């Protein structure tokens, strides 16, 4: 029937539909009273444009600075930047709050093998979280220390060789090499070989090149009807890239879970729990890729941001070096456990993840069917809500001097007593927060302390505005963080 109509009739029909939809979104929609820019309230294309150009978190922060703690960033989506929103949206369900805000499944589709993973709905998440908590426990972390330390030793060795040749080093690449080699070993029983080769493994390269495809597919999934069909056809190459990426991970996971070994990696703990009543092989494969991505790129980003801000703030660098040398007499004393008690080191990491959150975007949820109260206002059921990390952690309403790197704010400095610390949630919040938080902190403390024990760093001029240049496609699109290293003799 559609094809029997004349082209002008179809065009007129589309124009009428767009106009009617725009009028509805602006004047009749249940979220019409929430503030936001006109185009964002009128059409999803405004949001999609900023996703496409890699500036959505930055734009969202700008909108919060302009409109306040809640912004309508798309016709069906509200963004928040407060501690109260973290509690209302992501917190534990207690008292009268019994219904959860489920993950937005448009943002979190099933794995390419069609199986649910830990990032999906609550019932599925609870089961996977119980099983995956074993390899992430403090006990497991203690048994994994030898594996992790071995790769940090290798990092120091490779950087020392390059420092003695006065080479320019891109620390972003070396942090990625380290974190991916560690997570590859913990997840698959073998590293990606990045530290040894000084090259990025092709699978990791594919992750970074395909992340824009992931965001393109998110845009496509949010556009209904004919437009979605057209864009899906146009996005077949992106889908193929994502499938290839998953197939490699699937192959590696199969190779590992068919081996018989008791080495203390993730798979040993997962398989031990699976013998009781746990994951199917397909579920292990679906979750393996998430474990590697969540535990490697984010840690590398946090380390990159931390080193950058230390190099831009000589007083903080000097204070951290003093703490390191007051704590340790020999490098062999520096371990994941011995760095736990270092107050200023912890403050530096916290502050770096505030001004440069490893995941600066929003992980959206949907309001329960009956609606819910968020920040004192009722939001009807089925709409998208979320807290934007960048907007929350760099808001002057939450933090004094929000764009300044000041580790002392985490050390009891009276100037910052009014900071809203509960707005600071780099690992998310509530029962679905990041399982790998302890592993990430342990790795970051060890790597950073060992680096500062062994080297002095000179930030090259071309990298002095490293952070300001970056765009975001879910993760920071990090440029080179170029330094020269001077080996220290102890």
UniProtKB/Swiss-Prot annotation:
Its main location: membrane. Glycans are attached at residue 176. Heme binds at residue 434. Its EC number is 1.-.-.-. Pfam families: p450 (PF00067). Keywords: Glycoprotein, Heme, Iron, Membrane, Metal-binding, Monooxygenase, Oxidoreductase, Transmembrane, Transmembrane helix. This is Cytochrome P450 monooxygenase aclL. It comes from Aspergillus oryzae (strain ATCC 42149 / RIB 40) (Yellow koji mold). The gene is aclL.
